C-alpha cells in the first residue's frame, strides 16, 4: 500500500 507506507498519502 503506497499510501500507507507514505503516511496515508500525505
Swiss-Prot record:
It is found in: Secreted. PROSITE patterns: AKH (PS00256). GO terms for cellular component: extracellular region. Transmembrane segments: none annotated. One of its GO terms (biological process) is neuropeptide signaling pathway. Keywords: Amidation, Hormone, Neuropeptide, Pyrrolidone carboxylic acid, Secreted. InterPro entries: Adipokinetic_hormone_CS. The modification Pyrrolidone carboxylic acid is found at residue 1. GO terms for molecular function: hormone activity. The modification Asparagine amide is found at residue 10. Belongs to the AKH/HRTH/RPCH family. Hypertrehalosaemic factors are neuropeptides that elevate the level of trehalose in the hemolymph (trehalose is the major carbohydrate in the hemolymph of insects). This is Hypertrehalosaemic hormone. It comes from Helicoverpa zea.
